[in-house]
């Protein structure tokens, strides 16, 4: 039942009819489909984005200049650039790589360098911060056994050899951080974690 619905949800909608864009029906159908009918994981949503976009291209028959094509693409782009659930930003990255960066957008969009530079900048910030993707290497202070020791040079995070690496980002003005950091420090000093590196 799920597979049938997923593949036939838009069967009775003429995806080539741009008049639908002037009604609330089409956008609410898109939101219902991507929010409620599909599993909320990138592996389920990404193929359906491509399936829908290809179907619109065939039915609208105007290439990348079609209004249904671009309005649907833009709606999905806006929906997933700030997703509700962690991990769904992979969909935004996929849309950027497959459609915007490869030029599968209307010429007026592709030629708008200010807009394209802005969204490419957003893409560049997100592409290495996805779940399951290696983070950009970080340059770190090399410290002695005690944090009060003098600075001992620089190292890269990728050069740290350990089974586990815990990176803890905190703010000096954070009240909760002021309480929890001494507990982390105590846990590190008194347990086997220090011996294991």
Predicted features along the sequence, with ranges:
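Short, conserved, surface-exposed binding loops centered on an aromatic residue
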Residues: 128-130, 156-160, 191-193
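Active-site lining segments that contact anionic ligands and/or coordinate catalytic metals
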Residues: 135, 161-164, 195
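Oxidative protein folding and maturation machinery
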Residues: 1-148
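Short active-site neighborhood of thiol/selenol oxidoreductases, capturing the structured segment around
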Residues: 150-184
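Generic detector of well-ordered secondary structure
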Residues: 74, 97, 176-179, 186
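Structural microenvironment flanking redox-active thiols in thiol-disulfide oxidoreductases
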Residues: 178-197
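Conserved helix-loop functional segments at active or binding sites
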Residues: 144, 172, 186, 190
């Amino acid at each position: 039942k799920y597979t049938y619905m997923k593949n036939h949800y838009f069967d009775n909608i003429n995806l080539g009819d741009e008049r639908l864009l002037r009604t609330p029906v089409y956008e609410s159908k898109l939101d219902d489909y991507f929010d409620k009918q599909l599993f909320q994981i990138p592996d389920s949503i990404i193929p359906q984005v491509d399936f829908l976009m290809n179907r619109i291209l065939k039915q609208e028959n105007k290439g990348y200049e079609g209004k249904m094509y671009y309005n649907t693409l833009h709606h999905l782009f806006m929906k997933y650039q700030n997703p509700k659930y962690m991990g769904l930003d992979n969909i935004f990255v996929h849309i950027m790589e497959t459609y915007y960066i490869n030029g599968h957008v209307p010429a007026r969009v592709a030629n708008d360098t200010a807009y394209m530079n802005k969204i490419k900048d957003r893409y560049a910030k997100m592409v290495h911060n996805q779940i399951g993707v290696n983070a950009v290497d970080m340059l770190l202070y090399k410290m002695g056994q005690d944090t009060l020791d003098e600075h001992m040079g620089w190292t890269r995070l990728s050069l740290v050899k350990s089974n586990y690496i815990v990176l803890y980002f905190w703010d000096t003005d954070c009240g909760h951080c002021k309480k929890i950091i001494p507990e982390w420090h105590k846990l590190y000093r008194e347990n086997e974690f220090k011996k294991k590196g």
